[in-house]
């Protein structure tokens, strides 16, 4: 029996500004991700700070949360076997200069901060992140 895993994907303001959402979603579907929930929204600074609270004491916290509140984002709940690892591989390295050819960040990211997409890094993180943006009833079964 297959064990399906869920992960959060965020298409960040820089990629939305480049109108990359459709291309990124196509990449996800072509890599057998199932989209259980999707929405476009514009975070407030407080919402961005709540989402990234784990980084509150890091030097990049304020610039990151300012950036994440600077424009619309697309949040998705993705599902497949090994969803977290597979999505992180598709995203590419956090620093787009180190990202492999063919990855989302290599194509659309400009810098470590403006790096086009976010993805959960572990099961517990995914649970928190998904619940931050989606109520259970908002996700397809």
UniProtKB/Swiss-Prot annotation:
Keywords: ATP-binding, Cytoplasm, Kinase, Magnesium, Metal-binding, Nucleotide metabolism, Nucleotide-binding, Phosphoprotein, Transferase. Its EC number is 2.7.4.6. The keyword Nucleotide-binding applies. It is found in: Cytoplasm. ATP binds at residues 12, 60, 88, 94, 105, 115. The active site is at residue 118. SUPFAM superfamilies: Nucleoside diphosphate kinase, NDK (SSF54919). One of its GO terms (cellular component) is cytoplasm. It comes from the Bacteria. GO terms for biological process: CTP biosynthetic process; GTP biosynthetic process; UTP biosynthetic process. It holds the Pfam family NDK. Its cofactor is Mg(2+). GO terms for molecular function: ATP binding; metal ion binding; nucleoside diphosphate kinase activity. It catalyses: a 2'-deoxyribonucleoside 5'-diphosphate + ATP = a 2'-deoxyribonucleoside 5'-triphosphate + ADP; a ribonucleoside 5'-diphosphate + ATP = a ribonucleoside 5'-triphosphate + ADP. Belongs to the NDK family. Homotetramer. NCBIfam families: PRK00668.1 (NF001908). Major role in the synthesis of nucleoside triphosphates other than ATP. The ATP gamma phosphate is transferred to the NDP beta phosphate via a ping-pong mechanism, using a phosphorylated active-site intermediate. PANTHER family: NUCLEOSIDE DIPHOSPHATE KINASE (PTHR46161), NUCLEOSIDE DIPHOSPHATE KINASE DDB_G0292928-RELATED (PTHR46161:SF3). This is Nucleoside diphosphate kinase.
């Amino acid at each position: 029996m297959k064990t399906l895993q869920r992960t959060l994907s965020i298409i960040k303001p820089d990629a939305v500004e480049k109108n990359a959402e459709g291309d990124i979603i196509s990449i996800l579907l072509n890599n057998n991700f199932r989209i259980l929930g999707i929405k476009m929204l514009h975070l407030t600074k407080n919402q961005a700070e709540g989402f990234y609270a784990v980084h509150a004491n890091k030097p990049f916290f304020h610039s990151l949360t300012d950036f994440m509140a600077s424009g619309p984002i697309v949040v998705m709940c993705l599902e497949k076997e090994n969803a977290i690892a597979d999505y992180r591989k598709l995203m590419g390295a956090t620093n787009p200069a180190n990202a492999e050819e063919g990855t989302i960040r290599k194509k659309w990211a400009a810098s470590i901060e403006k790096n086009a997409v976010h993805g959960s890094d572990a099961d517990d993180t995914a649970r928190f992140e998904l619940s931050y943006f989606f109520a259970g009833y908002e996700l397809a079964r």
